[in-house]
């Protein structure tokens, strides 16, 4: 197996600032992102946002741990890079685009190299299932989280 990644987008019925508020609060991600089981902040920036975080994820064949550094370029981009962990490398980002009329396009991208040993476990149907959870499903999860928290 090579890299596990790709990108996926969805349109959210909420203004950019509401979507950014959810994306920016990285420590709540396990509440709404499937397979992401735990996050704990190791460092914060001057605004109190988590910048270095330990994560634990269930990728179906193994639980993987990582230390990730976040970069905030709000309200349109949140990116992260693995500093150390079970995967060889991980980089990802949320990119938000204001569509006007109270709508936002959210694009999730991920580029992860599981490395040789873990890569041997993530093949075929397991690879497809992992990609479905960790890439393709993310924008829909964000949409449900944001739209579900809006007063109706």
Task: Put a short name on every predicted segment.
Residues 1-48, 152:
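Hydrophobic ligand-binding cavity/cleft-lining segments
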Residues 15, 46-47, 75, 99-103:
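Short strand-connecting beta-turns/loops that link adjacent beta-strands
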Residues 8-12, 55, 94, 108-110:
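A structural signal for short, well-ordered beta-strand segments
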Residues 12, 33, 72-74, 84-86, ...:
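Short loop/turn positions at the edges of beta-strands in beta-sheet-rich folds
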Residues 81-136:
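Beta-strand/loop substructures that line and gate deep hydrophobic ligand-binding cavities in soluble
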Residues 30, 40-84, 136-152:
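Glycine-rich portal/gate segments that line the openings of hydrophobic small-molecule binding cavities
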Residues 5-7, 63-67, 88-93:
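Short, surface-exposed coil-to-beta transition loops
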């Amino acid at each position: 197996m090579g890299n596990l990644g790709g990108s996926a987008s969805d349109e959210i019925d909420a203004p950019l600032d509401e979507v950014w508020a959810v994306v920016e609060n990285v420590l709540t991600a396990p509440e709404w992102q499937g397979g992401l089981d735990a996050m704990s902040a190791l460092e914060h920036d001057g605004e109190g946002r988590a910048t270095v975080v330990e994560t634990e994820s269930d990728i179906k064949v193994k639980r993987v741990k990582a230390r990730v550094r976040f970069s905030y370029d709000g309200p349109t981009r949140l990116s992260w890079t693995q500093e150390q962990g079970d995967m060889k490398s991980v980089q990802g980002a949320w990119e938000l685009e204001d569509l006007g009329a109270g709508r936002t396009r959210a694009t999730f991208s991920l580029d992860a190299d599981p490395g040789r040993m873990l890569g041997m476990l993530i093949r075929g149907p397991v690879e497809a299932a992992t990609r479905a959870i960790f890439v393709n499903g993310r924008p829909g999860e964000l949409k449900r989280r944001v739209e579900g928290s809006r007063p109706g």
